[in-house]
Swiss-Prot record:
Region (Disordered): 56-184
Family (UniProt): Belongs to the TonB family.
Biased composition regions of type Basic and acidic residues, renumbered to the chain: 71-97, 113-151, 159-172
This protein's record includes keyword Ribosomal protein: no
Gene label: tonB
Record topological domains on the Cytoplasmic side: 1-14
Domain TonB C-terminal: 191-280
UniProt-recorded name of the protein: Protein TonB
Pfam families named among the record's database cross-references: TonB_C
Transmembrane spans: 15-35
GO molecular function: energy transducer activity
Domain of life of the organism encoding this protein: Bacteria
Summary of the function given for this chain in its UniProt record: Interacts with outer membrane receptor proteins that carry out high-affinity binding and energy dependent uptake into the periplasmic space of specific substrates. It could act to transduce energy from the cytoplasmic membrane to specific energy-requiring processes in the outer membrane, resulting in the release into the periplasm of ligands bound by these outer membrane proteins.
């Protein structure tokens, strides 16, 4: 059996055949055109002009020209480059160098004044110091008396006896000191010295502060008895005890001054006054 080809195959065959035929026709026309341009044209006879032109050549030339013109981009007119004017160089300002500050002259150090030699103090001649009687402040005694007055003590017979004994002892010491008084006062009668001693012992009081503290000692007092009976220049000449007893000795002489006998002439005396707590 014969099989007939399908319409698809037939259409493919016909298209390929038509393509080959059209390609062959185009190739023949193109070859003819090339041969036609290369063949020399016969010279025209005299008096006659013969111009032969083929439409294909005109069309092709015109097309090629138009295509060439269209293909060429229009050249825009180029702007001429402006000549740059040379910039004028501004004259540089000359910077003047700043003047250097002149160094200030250093002040010359002032010469220090030489210290003047101080005059050496002349050695002072020491005068012999007079032994003045040191008076004890009366405040302590006043306080003690005020305390005694404010607090009344019960006085017993024993206390009275003790005080009498102490007073007698102080009187004995003062009487016993008459021999010493005679040694300090040559040329004065014993009777006169005894009267002075008894007057002093009657007014002499042993300070309680000294008794409490157990202070003892001897005070040598000097004084002057004038012809009118006045007593002056009372002072402590020598002492081996405290100011409490020194003050008590001076007060004893001041209080007993009105009991002293009047001398015929001015007399300078030195009387030792002893204070002792020892019981015989």
């Amino acid at each position: 059996m014969k099989i007939s080809p399908s319409p698809r195959k037939l259409s493919k065959v016909s298209t390929s055949v038509s393509f080959l035929i059209s390609f062959a026709l185009y190739a023949i026309g193109f070859g003819y055109f090339l041969l036609r341009e290369d063949a020399p044209e016969p010279l025209a006879q005299a008096g006659t002009t013969k111009v032969t032109m083929s439409l294909a050549s005109i069309n092709t030339n015109s097309n090629t020209k138009t295509n060439a013109e269209s293909a060429k981009p229009k050249e825009e007119p180029k702007e001429k480059p402006k000549k740059e004017e040379p910039k004028k160089e501004e004259p540089k300002k000359e910077t003047k160098p700043k003047p250097k500050p002149k160094p200030k002259p250093k002040p010359k150090p002032k010469p220090k004044p030489k210290p003047e030699p101080k005059p050496k103090p002349e050695p002072k001649v020491e005068e012999p110091k007079k032994e003045e009687p040191k008076e004890e402040p009366k405040k302590e005694e006043a306080k003690e008396e005020a305390k005694e007055k404010s607090v009344p003590k019960q006085v017993t017979t024993k206390d009275i006896v003790k005080e009498k004994d102490k007073q007698e002892e102080s009187n004995k010491t003062s009487e016993g000191a008459t021999s010493e008084a005679q040694a300090y006062n040559p040329g004065v009668s014993n009777e006169f010295l005894m009267k002075i001693q008894t007057a002093i012992s009657s007014k002499n009081r042993y300070p309680k502060m000294a008794q409490i503290r157990g202070i003892e000692g001897e005070v040598l007092v000097s004084f002057t008895i004038n012809a009118d009976g006045s007593v002056t220049d009372i002072k402590v000449v020598k002492s081996n005890t405290t100011d409490i007893l020194n003050h008590a000795a001076l007060e004893a002489i001041k209080s007993a001054a009105h009991l002293f006998p009047k001398p015929d002439e001015t007399v300078h005396l030195k009387i030792p006054i002893a204070y002792s707590l020892k019981e015989d």
